[in-house]
């Protein structure tokens, strides 16, 4: 839901400040963030997709659910579940996706973590501590509290799901966004799910074939 701190959380993780540049303080596009963390003495990469929380962008949220490997539901501790939070839960459950709940803003004086968990339980989201299967991380994006716990749970859940790509295969992925640049020509933001994409390769989208002239990460 809007204002629950999704972009602020990603800013904290990625050490960026994207929230300051958003029109009206809300995310209006799907943004991809590629980060590397250390997990059990190994380097691990995570690609985050930041989705808009405003009600006007439900199609974007559904699109992300359809292409992601696992979901992080960010809920503000001082606001609990709101209409777009519930909508996201329905999308996640319908697509049977692995879920981690991040209860954000626990640093606020009016935070009510118990209410958030009770509201989540109404939608069959029960924490591991209460006998369920869903990891629920209580954190603060503002103070950096328990951010490491969230990242570790993401990696451990991904390993449990055996999410591995075969770099020898032809690339398969999804186009998150595309536009026509006056100097570069057609530009697309692509999430590669499997295989490797290289300059000079051809990509096929519906009935269109395009050659890759440049790749920027």
What are the roles of these predicted feature ranges?
Residues 1-49, 188-194, 201-204:
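Conserved G1/Walker A P-loop phosphate-binding module
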Residues 3, 20, 82-83, 103-112, ...:
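Ordered, soluble secondary-structure elements with a strong preference for glycine-centered loop motifs
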Residues 3-5, 11, 132-217:
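Conserved catalytic-core segments of large NTP-driven translation/proteostasis enzymes
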Residues 17-24, 37-44, 57, 82, ...:
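Active-site phosphate-binding and catalytic loops of NTP-dependent enzymes
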Residues 22-70, 77, 91-93, 178:
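Switch I (G2) and immediately adjacent beta-strands of P-loop GTPase domains
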Residues 55, 66-86, 93-114, 187:
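Conserved Switch II/interswitch segment of TRAFAC-class P-loop GTPases
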Residues 105-132, 145-155:
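GTPase G-domain guanine-specificity segment
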């Amino acid at each position: 839901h809007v204002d629950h701190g999704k972009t602020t959380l990603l800013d904290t993780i990625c050490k960026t400040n994207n929230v300051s540049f958003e029109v009206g303080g809300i995310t209006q596009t799907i943004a991809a963030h590629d980060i590397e963390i250390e997990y059990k003495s190994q380097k691990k990469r995570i690609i985050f997709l930041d989705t808009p929380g405003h009600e006007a962008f439900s199609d974007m949220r559904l699109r992300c659910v359809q292409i992601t490997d696992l979901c992080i539901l960010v809920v503000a501790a001082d606001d609990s579940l709101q209409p777009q939070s519930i909508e996201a839960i329905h999308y996640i459950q319908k697509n049977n996706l692995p879920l981690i709940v991040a209860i954000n803003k626990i640093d606020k004086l009016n935070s009510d973590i118990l209410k958030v968990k009770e509201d989540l339980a109404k939608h069959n989201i029960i924490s591991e501590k209460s006998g369920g299967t869903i990891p629920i991380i209580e954190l603060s994006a503002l103070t950096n509290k328990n951010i490491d716990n969230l990242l570790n749970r993401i990696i451990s859940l991904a390993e449990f799901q055996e999410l591995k790509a075969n770099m020898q295969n032809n690339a398969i992925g999804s186009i998150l966004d595309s536009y026509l640049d006056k100097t570069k020509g057609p530009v697309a933001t692509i999430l590669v799910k499997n295989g490797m994409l290289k300059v000079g390769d051809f990509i096929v989208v519906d009935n269109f074939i395009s050659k890759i002239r440049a790749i920027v990460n």
